[in-house]
Amino acid sequence: MAARNAFYAQSGGVTAVINASACGVLETARQYPDRIGTVYAGRNGIVGALTEDLIDTGQESAEAIAALRHTPSGAFGSCRYKLKGLEENRAQYERLIEVFRAHDIGYFFYNGGGDSADTCLKVSQLSEKLGYPLQAVHIPKTVDNDLPITDCCPGFGSVAKYIAVSVREASFDVRSMAATSTCIFVLEVMGRHAGWIAAAGGLASDERHELALVILFPEQVFDPERFLRAVDEKVRSHGYCSVVVSEGIRGADGRFVAESGSRDVFGHARLGGVAPVIADLIKERLGYKYHWAVADYLQRAARHIASRTDVEQAYAVGKAGVEMALKGLSAVMPAIVRTSDSPYRWEITAASLAEVANVEKKMPLEFISADGFGITEACRRYLRPLIEGEDYPPYAGGLPDYVTLCNVAVPKKLAASFSV
């Protein structure tokens, strides 16, 4: 059987370790030249497939591919472009198959979150209907940690580490200034519906470093009065308070506290900044001087402080995705299965995309403390291993030495263009 080519694309918000997954895919594919020819990457994600804007990863040296493991963000470009329903816009999916057929692509690796899992499943279903042989594998990635079945999502562990470290360091800072200056620090973190990232801030405080923290989770209805009492108690007992707030907290009316009224391309409510809203509330009602910050891109781009566990898992799911495809599996996702908390042990298994697509994993309520503003010991047991270990990139001139690929374009074979 002749070798067939593969297509790899990155989707949605990038992470500190998504390129490690790309590295896992590419290095593993290169080990099977008799089965996989060239791995093409989509320039700017799935949009690259629709527009036949493909990148020939075969033009990259082994050293450059290896360097992806320690390089953040998306080396081939990503996108926030959601393919519509299969019946609603069949033309988009047929276009993908058309491009795949033109370039003899028999393997489809889509590296992203929940929406990407849905797209991968639909492409698999359509290829089967059209009689086009294709192994479609979803490579998990999301800092939100909200994909089902898998113990955790590659990308989350490094964000969790960044937030835990940042909250600890900022809390030390505000604690030292509180007597005569700022006594409130508010940090806004990502997490539209799931409070995993906010929970990671709770790791900043432990038996060795007791810090005055209040965490606002999207799983809990935001009650301004209860929140203000909690903050006031912390300031009175510790002299200061650090607040970690998820961007997705909602009020009793069900609306996002930070909702701006518009929606993004996925139809999700576009959120403004919740940190200044919370900080202003504290100032107005309690009179405390504050500083606020939004972790934003910093939390997901911080490869210099990535979790070694996260890097290893990101690479592993990329590698496993190729191995699953070569075994003939399709419409699956490499899922991480935890076999032990301490020491932390895990393995990879194949999860059906039918059970992954359009399912959002919330943080268990038993991970939130009884007062609603902290994390429990069960949550700590879950989170701690995910931020363990350091995996520093090489440095040059005092800065991380990341790789920029050549990203050589593949000549187009189709006469028809496709607009997105």
Curated annotation (Swiss-Prot):
Cofactor(s) needed: Mg(2+); Co(2+); Mn(2+)
Temperature-related activity annotation: Optimum temperature is 30 degrees Celsius.
Positions with a binding annotation for diphosphate: G13
GO process annotations (BP): fructose 6-phosphate metabolic process
Chief location bin: cytoplasm
Tree of life domain: Bacteria
Keywords: Cytoplasm, Glycolysis, Kinase, Magnesium, Metal-binding, Transferase
Catalytic machinery residues: D144
UniProt note: pH dependence: Optimum pH is 7.0.
Sites annotated Important for catalytic activity: K141
Enzyme Commission number(s) of this protein: 2.7.1.90
Pathway assignment: Carbohydrate degradation; glycolysis; D-glyceraldehyde 3-phosphate and glycerone phosphate from D-glucose: step 3/4
Substrates-to-products reaction catalysed: beta-D-fructose 6-phosphate + diphosphate = beta-D-fructose 1,6-bisphosphate + phosphate + H(+)
Annotated positions for site Important for catalytic activity and substrate specificity: D115
Entry's Gene Ontology molecular function annotations: 6-phosphofructokinase activity; diphosphate-fructose-6-phosphate 1-phosphotransferase activity; metal ion binding
Protein family per UniProt: Belongs to the phosphofructokinase type A (PFKA) family. PPi-dependent PFK group II subfamily. Clade 'B2' sub-subfamily.
Function: Catalyzes the phosphorylation of D-fructose 6-phosphate, the first committing step of glycolysis. Uses inorganic phosphate (PPi) as phosphoryl donor instead of ATP like common ATP-dependent phosphofructokinases (ATP-PFKs), which renders the reaction reversible, and can thus function both in glycolysis and gluconeogenesis. Consistently, PPi-PFK can replace the enzymes of both the forward (ATP-PFK) and reverse (fructose-bisphosphatase (FBPase)) reactions.
UniProt subunit comment: Homodimer.
NCBIfam families the UniProt entry points to: PRK14072.1
Official protein name in the record: Pyrophosphate--fructose 6-phosphate 1-phosphotransferase
Organism this protein belongs to: Methylococcus capsulatus (strain ATCC 33009 / NCIMB 11132 / Bath)
